[in-house]
């Protein structure tokens, strides 16, 4: 059984930390708590599991390692391996993904974005253009972390009611929303600054997502996609999620990469 040396960070107990709980509940892994801000896999503690959004924060430095699996920013180095990424609340997403998701005809929102700008880095990637002009259901509040318009359950349900969903850079080039869109089969509209290539299994344009450079391109792009094309993309998104970001899929991927680079 794979052993994970995990750190305990109560204020950040979501995303990968919540996924670790799910791996443990399913008896995929054995865990042991360690001090610090990083997680390790394997008995020798040689495999770094870097789930943090950035690698350049002086208060959260990357320690020495033999092989590192990186979820968001992936440094350009042979010891740094593209991994997968995680929803903000994997348990809630797992629950809605396991339900009967709305079909094409039942999705009454054509395009959607729900988010927030909480820091200058997010502002640079999200406020550089007026994305609200290209999205039918657009909500983005500005300011420090705090209350949101929707509960986490409402947010995921609403996301699943849309045919297309805009992705914008987060605190890193990937965002939890990217994975949430794939999970509920809402076809991503990928904006500049988003990284969809630095995964173990990269996203493929016009298979998993459509790409735009400006808000003005969005309506023409999504209008050109037929119902049958959307269904194919919807299914490809969900299959990618199952292979790479679901509870079982993310564990099998992690196990595969550790075995490959031992």
Which sequence ranges carry the predicted segments?
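Short glycine/proline-enriched coil/turn segments at helix->beta-strand junctions
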Residues: 42-44, 214, 226-229
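Glycine-rich loops and low-complexity Gly/Arg-rich segments
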Residues: 190-194, 214-215, 234-237
């Amino acid at each position: 059984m794979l052993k994970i040396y995990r750190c305990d960070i109560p204020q950040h107990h979501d995303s990968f930390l919540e996924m670790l709980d799910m791996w443990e509940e399913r008896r995929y892994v054995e865990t042991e708590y360690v001090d610090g801000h990083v997680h390790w896999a394997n008995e020798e503690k040689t495999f770094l599991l870097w789930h943090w959004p950035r690698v350049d924060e002086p208060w959260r430095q990357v320690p020495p390692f033999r092989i590192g699996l990186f979820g968001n920013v992936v440094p350009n180095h042979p010891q740094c391996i593209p991994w997968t990424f995680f929803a903000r609340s994997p348990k809630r997403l797992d629950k809605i993904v396991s339900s009967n998701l709305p079909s094409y005809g039942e999705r009454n929102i054509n395009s959607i974005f729900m988010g927030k700008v909480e820091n200058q880095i997010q502002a640079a990637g999200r406020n550089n253009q007026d994305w609200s002009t290209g999205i039918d259901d657009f909500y983005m509040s500005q300011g420090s972390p705090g209350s949101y318009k929707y509960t986490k359950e409402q947010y995921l349900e609403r996301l699943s009611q849309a045919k297309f969903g805009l992705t914008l850079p987060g605190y890193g080039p990937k965002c939890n929303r990217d994975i949430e869109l794939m999970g509920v089969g809402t076809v991503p509209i990928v904006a500049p600054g988003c990284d969809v290539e630095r995964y173990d299994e990269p996203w493929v344009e016009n298979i998993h997502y459509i790409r735009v450079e400006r808000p003005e391109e969005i309506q023409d792009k999504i209008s050109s996609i037929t119902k049958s094309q959307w269904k194919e993309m919807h299914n490809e998104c969900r299959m990618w999620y199952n292979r790479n970001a679901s509870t079982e899929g993310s564990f099998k991927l992690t196990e595969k990469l550790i075995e490959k680079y031992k």
